[in-house]
Curated annotation (Swiss-Prot):
UniProt-annotated location(s): Mitochondrion intermembrane space; Cytoplasm, Cytosol
Gene for this chain: NLN
GO cellular component, one term: mitochondrial intermembrane space
Keyword match Metal-binding: yes
PANTHER family xref list: NEUROLYSIN, MITOCHONDRIAL, PROTEASE M3 THIMET OLIGOPEPTIDASE-RELATED
GO BP, sorted A to Z: peptide metabolic process; proteolysis
Cofactor(s) needed: Zn(2+)
Role, per record: Hydrolyzes oligopeptides such as neurotensin, bradykinin and dynorphin A. Acts as a regulator of cannabinoid signaling pathway by mediating degradation of hemopressin, an antagonist peptide of the cannabinoid receptor CNR1.
Cofactor note: Binds 1 zinc ion per subunit.
Source species taxonomy: Eukaryota, Metazoa, Chordata, Craniata, Vertebrata
Chief location bin: mitochondrion
Catalytic activity: Preferential cleavage in neurotensin: 10-Pro-|-Tyr-11
E.C. no: 3.4.24.16
Protein name: Neurolysin, mitochondrial
Length: 704
């Protein structure tokens, strides 16, 4: 998942809050109110600070609002006939960079700080700044000057990226309703402010959730000793199991006690149920009403207009077609799982209920992998200590993309476990950016896996380039005494995926902050990172990523062959579940009268063939709904069509570590950032229109 500092200028929500904003900022002549910010705006520097106290966060938030508002006010009073490219468009870009960087220091700590008071202050700053963003985004005086500039300037005389910036600015202004009557604008503004707060609260609730369950050792049957020994014990000699990924998934995949899995699945899918259900009941109608006032049939239609899919009709057709193609495969996989369950219930003396329950799915899919391919993930993870995986991952990316990474000593970070690296072009030595690695869970930390864009890589007023900065935030298991953190293969894949987002953020070289890094269409943003997941299914790459944590021996060829062969295991059910989530997301954003829990239950039964557990409400735990993927979750599958096409037609054909193909990918897919449309970048790379052939093959389906 990608969480960008620049989602604001795309008019999307982001994890932790919404920045629904067309940032109409101002020019060089009026920069004096922001001189206090200018001291840290320097080329080739990471200017971010992570030591702000709650009081400083609050003070700097108000200062940022005051200073920025003065700039907006000044441009709003400018005689419209005096508006030029230099004093308006270029000036917008200059101020935008400063605002983004300062804002990042104020709102990012809510996701990663170890201090609860800092997280709370950061969350409040995000809410306060989001309200301010909306106010500024809906200033008609600024919008009219942008429109005037577009109508009067010679577009052919400005650079293509500047022309795109101008056209997108006008488009975003209209998508904010600035062409509508004042009364309608005020309605939209009020609703957007409320939506922003709801999104922030939705994900804050999930991040702060500290639910845990208590089990005896017998109730954790079949779980490995190293996992059980890592758990905190209660006074009654039982074990605490949290709902964080490093606890939840091992239990769901390996615990042989159905009742334990049932309790865990029930708790996991009722996290924040009461409060987040209420939030969704408020948020979804607000989105629909804003879309209606802007002239769209539904919120999904509103957001899809800016994506490569363009319409709900195209998305529905894509999901329904894929669902039908996968139906036979899903049925076969369910039948196999049901037979496994029947056999195990007989052997262990459990009651066999004749169906696959939600808490059975991960467990029996793991057994399927072990039986069909002899892949034991517990044995396998001993070859993936996190230090070895990290070193191998960094080496592969450096070699593939022509980069060099250097760890920064004594780096300024938000937690002692976080590391910082500088990225340089290997050929020229030019510094491109920096990235943080925040790998382990902490109380209150963002509880999924994501790349956060923190500092945009773009041009500064003096023509020099600001380096891009990103953070990879994941939650792998903590190291134990005498044993490093060991990763499951699916965690290695997650690591590669999210680091692909980091490379997109770092390698993009754009003029404008608005187009920097991963600031592309939402249904294209996953393409680069998904494409790079293929490396964790390549035997040679896996050798570079692995070494036994105790004796340092390489992973055996036999184990490698089995792992690579297992790529297609459970692919039908896994893809059908993605379709379920995509359909739920589309449904909730096309018909607000629907009940989220009921809609999820309906599609689980109809498409996945595994009923949702009564009493749960998975959508209330679905952070994507409030994190920038509203109406756009389909993008994960949609993007895979493109990513698989790129991999099989170029990398697989020419060699996955071929440096020429790697540089072509870096230059044609990563470097443009959002300065080109996603489909144009794809066609430049493929030299043809993309097709579904490779994607269908990757799912074990016949290609047309």
């Amino acid at each position: 998942m990608i969480v960008q500092c620049l989602l604001a200028v795309r008019g999307l929500h982001r994890v932790g809050g919404s920045r629904i904003l067309f940032r109409m900022t101002l020019g060089r002549e009026e920069m004096s109110p922001l001189q206090a910010m200018s001291s840290y705006m320097a080329a080739g520097r990471n200017v971010l600070r992570w030591d702000l106290s709650p009081e400083q966060i609050k003070t700097r938030t108000e200062e940022l609002i005051s200073q920025t508002k003065q700039v907006y006010d000044a441009i709003g009073m400018r005689d419209i006939k005096e508006v030029t490219y230099e004093n308006c468009l270029q000036a917008l870009a200059d101020i935008e960079v400063k605002y983004i960087v300062e804002r990042t220091m104020l709102d990012f700590p809510q996701h990663v700080s170890s201090d609860k008071e800092v997280r709370a202050a950061s969350t409040e700053a995000d809410k306060r700044l989001s309200r301010f963003d909306i106010e500024m985004s809906m200033r008609q005086d600024i919008f009219l000057r942008i429109v005037h500039l577009k109508e009067t300037c010679d577009l052919e005389k400005i650079k293509p990226e500047a022309r795109r910036y101008l056209e997108k600015s006008v488009k975003m202004g209209k998508r904010n309703g600035l062409h509508l009557p004042e009364q309608v604008q005020n309605e939209i503004k009020a609703m957007k402010k409320r939506m922003s707060e709801l999104c922030i609260d939705f994900n804050k609730n999930l991040n702060e959730d500290d639910t845990f369950l208590v089990f005896s050792k017998a109730e954790l049957g079949a779980l490995p000793d190293d996992f059980i020994n890592s758990l905190e014990k209660t006074d009654g000699d039982k074990y605490k199991i949290t709902l964080k990924y490093p606890h939840y998934f091992p239990v769901m995949k390996k615990c042989c006690v159905p009742e334990t899995r049932r309790k865990m699945e029930m708790a996991f899918n009722t996290r924040c149920k009461e409060e987040n259900t209420v939030i969704l009941q408020q948020l979804l109608p607000l989105r629909a009403e804003v879309a209606r006032l802007l002239g769209y049939s539904t919120h999904a239609d509103f957001v899809l207009e800016m994506n490569t899919a363009k319409s709900t009709r195209h998305v529905t057709a894509f999901l329904d077609d894929l669902s039908q193609k996968l139906k036979p495969l899903g049925e076969a996989e369910r039948e196999f799982i049901l037979n496994l369950k029947k056999k195990e219930c007989k052997e262990r003396g459990f009651e066999y209920d004749g169906k696959i329950n939600a808490w059975d799915l991960h467990y029996y899919m793991t057994q399927t992998e072990e039986l069909k391919y002899s892949v034991d993930q517990e044995t396998l993870k001993e070859y993936f200590p996190i230090e070895v995986v990290t070193e191998g991952l960094l080496n592969i990316y450096q070699e593939l993309l022509g980069l060099s990474f250097e760890q920064v000593t004594d780096a300024h970070v938000w937690n002692k476990s976080v590391t910082l690296y500088t990225v340089k072009d290997k050929a020229t030595g030019e510094v491109l950016g920096q990235f943080y690695l925040d790998l382990y869970p902490r109380e209150g930390k963002y509880n999924h896996a994501a790349c956060f864009g923190l500092q945009p890589g773009c041009l500064l007023p003096d023509g020099s380039r600001m380096m891009s900065v990103a953070a990879l935030v994941v939650n792998f298991s903590q190291p134990l005494a005498g044993r490093p953190s060991l990763l499951r293969h699916d965690e290695v894949r997650t690591y590669f995926h999210e680091f692909g987002h980091v490379m997109h953020q770092i390698c993009a070289q754009t003029d404008f902050a608005r187009f920097s890094g991963t600031n592309v269409e939402t249904d294209f943003v996953e393409v680069p990172s998904q494409m790079l997941e293929n490396w964790v299914w390549d035997a040679d790459s896996l050798r570079r990523l692995s070494k036994h944590y105790r004796h340092g021996s390489p992973i055996t060829d036999d184990l490698l062959e089995k792992l690579v062969a297992s790529r297609l295991v459970n692919t039908g059910l896994l893809t059908l579940r993605q379709i379920v989530l995509s359909k739920v997301d589309q449904s909730l954003h096309t018909n607000t009268a629907l009940d989220a829990a009921s809609e999820y239950a309906k599609y689980c039964t109809e498409i996945l063939g595994v009923a949702a557990t009564p009493g749960t409400n998975m959508p209330a735990t679905f952070g994507h709904l409030a994190g920038g993927y509203d109406g756009q979750y389909y993008g994960y599958l949609w993007s895979e069509v493109f990513s698989m096409d790129m991999f099989y037609s170029c990398f697989k054909k020419e060699g996955i570590m071929n440096p020429e193909v790697g540089m072509k990918y870096r230059n044609l897919i990563l470097k443009p950032g959002g300065s080109l449309d996603g489909m144009d970048m794809l066609q430049n790379f493929l030299t043809r229109e993309p097709n579904q052939k490779a994607f269908l093959m990757s799912r074990g389906l016949p290609a047309p």
